[in-house]
C-alpha cells in the first residue's frame, strides 16, 4: 500500500507506524475518531486506504486536537486548497525575484513568532 506523505513535520508523528496502527482496526466500522490529530498521519493514511478500495472501512471521520491552529490548517487544506496554492505560488515568485530579501523576510517572520 502506498504511504501518504505527511502534510506537517510534527514531533511524535505516527507516519512510520500508520499502516501498523490501522492493521489493528476492525475491517469495517461506522466512525473514525482521531482525538490527537497532530500531523494527521494516521487519518490521512486511513482516508487514502478508504478511498482506494471497493469496500470502504468506515463512513465518517472526525478529528480534533488541543491546538486550534492545527485544526485551522487542516480546514484550509480541506475547504480552501486554492488559498494555499496561491499563497505559496506568491512566496515562490517573490523568492525568485529577490532571493536575499525574501530569505530575510521569512527568517524575520519565523524569528518573531516561530511558525
Range-by-range predicted roles:
Residues 18, 31, 44, 61-64, ...:
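Functionally constrained cores in energy, signaling, and assembly domains
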Residues 1-37, 41-42, 49:
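S-adenosyl-L-methionine
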Residues 50-115:
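Class I S-adenosyl-L-methionine-dependent methyltransferase module
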Residues 41-45, 70-73:
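Short catalytic/ligand-binding loop motif for oxyanion handling, primarily in non-cytosolic enzymes
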Amino acid at each position: 500500500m502506498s504511504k501518504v506523505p505527511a502534510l506537517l513535520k510534527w514531533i511524535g508523528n505516527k507516519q512510520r507506524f500508520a499502516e501498523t496502527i490501522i492493521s489493528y482496526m476492525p475491517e469495517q466500522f461506522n466512525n473514525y475518531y482521531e482525538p490527537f490529530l497532530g500531523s494527521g498521519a494516521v487519518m490521512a493514511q486511513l482516508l487514502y486506504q478508504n478511498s482506494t478500495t471497493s469496500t470502504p472501512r468506515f463512513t465518517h471521520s472526525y478529528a480534533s486536537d488541543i491546538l486550534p491552529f492545527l485544526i485551522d490548517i487542516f480546514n484550509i487544506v480541506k475547504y480552501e486548497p486554492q488559498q494555499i496554492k496561491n499563497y505559496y505560488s506568491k512566496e515562490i515568485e517573490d523568492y525568485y525575484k529577490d532571493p536575499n530579501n525574501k530569505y530575510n523576510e521569512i527568517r524575520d517572520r519565523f524569528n518573531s513568532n516561530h511558525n
